[in-house]
Amino acid sequence: MSHLRETDADRRKEDEVARLLATTWNCEPIRTKDQSRVDTLFMRDKSLVAVAEIKARRNRQFATFSSVQLNLQNWFSLVQFEMAAEVPAFMVFAFDDGIYYVRAATIQIGQCRLSVRGRTDRPGIDERQPVIEIGNLLWKRLREPDAEGFSR
């Protein structure tokens, strides 16, 4: 969803997901500015330990899809952030049946289907964008953290 069309309800849901992740990972979530390429920074003891782009999908079940679409720009941003900051960068999707995540750097882009998707029912020329389809087998369901705090 474009940050320009994101609603307060969308932000509240994303914040709720960020708080759940932070509790599981023993961190503090910090929301970034609206135009940032990552939604949330995760801090522990005043140190950055991870970043995430979070999407909340209402009235949808993860199991009904064979893949999840990710904006190609979001993937680039997450991978670049991970390289620069040397912390894990995650793409997180919240569905009605759970919260699922994948570490961006583990996605082999050459094995993903690339397409152009978006809203075709709106007149704006900026409604479509390149996306990659990430197979469901790459996604992990939120669970207890490992010894380092994050499931790798």
Sequence positions of predicted segments:
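Catalytic micro-motifs at enzyme active sites that drive phosphoryl/nucleotidyl and oxygen chemistry
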Residues: 29-30, 39, 79
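Conserved catalytic cores of phosphodiester-cleaving nucleases, focusing on short active-site segments
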Residues: 21, 40-42, 46-60
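Beta-rich catalytic cores
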Residues: 36
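Catalytic cores of nucleic-acid endonucleases
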Residues: 1-8, 55-101
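Acidic-basic catalytic patches of nuclease active cores, encompassing PD-(D/E)XK
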Residues: 1-32
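Alpha-helix C-cap/termination motif
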Residues: 24, 43-46, 81-85
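Non-catalytic C-terminal interaction segments of nucleic acid-processing enzymes
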Residues: 5, 23, 43, 93-152
